[in-house]
From Swiss-Prot:
InterPro entries, sorted: ATG101 (IPR012445)
Name under which the protein is recorded: Autophagy-related protein 101
Source organism per UniProt: Rattus norvegicus (Rat)
Record keyword Disulfide bond present: no
Assembly description: Interacts with ATG13. Associates with a complex composed of ATG13, ULK1 and RB1CC1; the association with this complex requires the presence of ATG13.
Cellular compartments per GO CC: Atg1/ULK1 kinase complex; phagophore assembly site
Stretches the record annotates as Important for interaction with ATG13: 152-156
Source species taxonomy: Eukaryota, Metazoa, Chordata, Craniata, Vertebrata
Amino acid sequence: MNCRSEVLEVSVEGRQVEEAMLAVLHTVLLHRSTGKFHYKKEGTYSIGTVGIQDVDCDFIDFTYVRVSSEELDRALRKVVGEFKDALRNSGGDGLGQMSLEFYQKKKSRWPFSDECIPWEVWTVKVHVVALATEQERQICREKVGEKLCEKIINIVEVMSRHEYLPKMPTQSELDNVFDTGLRDVQPYLYKISFQITEALGTSVTTTMRRLIKDTLAL
């Protein structure tokens, strides 16, 4: 099975990390979630509805749409909070990345554990910039909003392509494809990881600093 991989890069101020990452992760999961499956008998089922809601950012001029699931939101906020803290405590230049991997399970015979086969991975490379003045922060608030809008549009365009998705499973195989542990929504199986690194390029950060500098010069 071929695994599709997408990479995004963002440059943000420290206080914008959480909102930017939540906007990206929630957007991806909005398009990779379904309502709960309700089986009548094997091969016959109905799918519940998925509620959505708008989220206004506090530190970015941006509003995104997410699945209306408090359980899913709490799970994402937990790992994003850990990533934000790791960035802040790294003592370096604030470089890191988060990966959202979708996978399906392949049952293995005892005593081997099930195999997890990835079919789509989203990686977001993040560079935190330090700003000196409130004027710079206000400009960054606007520019990050514009850039984030471009990223979200790109995500939606990628999601609209007719590429691989796991086939709808039978009732007995549902847990091999979907996360059935949430009460109100059913995302494809996923896992999120992050790392703090000094190996990322700084082209996005350079572009952001240039945008701020050019705006100040107007």
